[in-house]
Amino acid sequence: MYAALRLLTISGVFALSIWGCSTARPDGPFDPGTVPPTPDYSKLDNWAAHPDKADAADRTPCPEAVDWQKTAQADVFFLYPTSYYGRGTRSKTWNAAVDDPKVNTRTDSASILYQATIFNGAGRVFAPRYRQAHLQAFFTKDKESAEKALTVAYSDVLAAFDYYLKYWNNGRPFVVVGHSQGSVHAMNLIRERIEGTPLHSKLIAAYLVGWPVKRDFFRVVKPCESPTETGCFCTWRTWE
């Protein structure tokens, strides 16, 4: 599932140039006994953004801009990038706890505030907190531990998406958005839950940002070729 890790060599150099000096490493190989508790997505605390609560995704850059989430006809399922790194006792496991205040502050004050907000004029924003894999999962030589950590993270994404579909979607069209680690999970979510199913007809578009998408990764979902095309994906590098 996560063979795409091999594609990260160049972007890894970039990321390490930013975080390399301050990034802690997990203590030893992946240990199932240290995995944080599974999130309960019926609790709004386990959503970084949700239309039924006030959060950073509600912000607008100026008084003229409007948050249209209350009247929007579509939804946005947003998967934020890695914010689990740095030093401290809670940075020594392979997966972040969804109630880690330091990680959540990083997530909310950066990705949710400056990325998820661009969608609040078009749809209701749903951004689940998930037990994201540690940043080192993308650079370690311990590929087995990295894959296990990413699998834990992805299991949360699946659970959150399934809960969203069951209780909040109500047949509405939706956009899937991911950035970096979030894009890795979004790609697998689309391939396993959306393309080739009735849900595909509800997919407006997918934005898979900051991660390479191989031409043959999807069976049916194709790159968008026009502003009016639906059921397709857009992707680009977020660095030069």
What are these regions (language model features)?
Residues 75-79, 126-129, 175-176, 205-208, ...:
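Structural recognition of the beta-strand scaffold that forms the well-ordered cores
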